[in-house]
A protein has these predicted regions:
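Flexible loop/coil segments at beta-strand boundaries within sensory signal-transduction domains
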Residues: 9-14, 170
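PAS-family sensory domains
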Residues: 14-24
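Cyclic nucleotide signaling catalytic output domains
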Residues: 114, 140, 144, 150, ...
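Conserved long alpha-helical elements within nucleotide-processing catalytic cores of c-di-GMP signaling
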Residues: 29, 36-40, 46-72, 79-109, ...
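Short catalytic/binding micro-motifs of nucleotide second-messenger systems
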Residues: 8, 63, 106-111, 143-155
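Sensory-domain boundary capping and coupling elements
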Residues: 3-5, 22, 159
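Signal-transmission coiled-coil "S-helix"-like helices
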Residues: 26, 30-33, 175
Length: 182
């Protein structure tokens, strides 16, 4: 709620009238919140997008430089996903991507971040992750993806490819790390 007042004076400077205005800002607040959500999240999966990933990794880079630490970035894409879209349609493929996102999320810690770049490409930021952690998470993901998916009474499996990049060894920026992991 926004309150504002206007005071009206006569020629002698004496208050003649005082008018108060009250404005409900709920709709404006909700619109700003929605704009922020759209700016930072993937519409299909609800996951963070590249912009939010970039901010998170830039913060991690600053922290790692101060503390001489590191982290890992995984680049994941679904193998032969185009076949699903071409044979079963994009709406079905979109639902598959949502299922994949849910399943990937179960393989991560709360401090990690799963992002969808677009299409069938995902990036995972592993907070404080080293090569051992990155390999363990990658194996967990590969094992989880081997479990069959079921959608519209149809069972199918999806394989994925995962690349790993470690900060600072494989790159000093978000783009370098993603490129190296890809």
């Amino acid at each position: 709620v926004q309150l504002s007042w206007v005071v009206l004076y006569d020629d002698a400077g004496k208050v003649m009238q005082s008018i108060g205005f009250m404005r409900d800002l709920t709709a404006q607040h909700n619109a700003q919140k929605r704009i922020k959500e759209l700016a930072y999240t993937d519409v299909l999966t609800g996951l963070p997008n590249r912009l939010l990933l970039s901010q998170r990794v830039e913060t991690a880079i600053a922290d790692a430089q101060e503390q001489s630490g590191g982290f890992a970035v995984l680049f994941l894409d679904l193998d032969r996903f185009k076949i699903i879209n071409d044979s079963l349609g994009h709406p079905f493929g979109d639902r598959v991507l949502q299922l994949v996102a849910e399943r990937l999320q179960t393989c991560l810690r709360q401090t990690d971040m799963l992002c969808r770049l677009g299409g069938d490409e995902f990036v995972i930021y592993l907070h404080g992750g080293n090569a051992t952690v990155a390999e363990g998470v990658s194996r967990r993901i590969l094992d989880e993806m081997l479990r069959p998916f079921t959608l519209d009474d149809m069972g199918f499996s999806i394989q994925c490819s995962i690349g790993i990049a470690l900060y600072p060894h494989d790159g000093l920026s978000v783009d370098d790390l993603i490129k190296q992991a890809d």
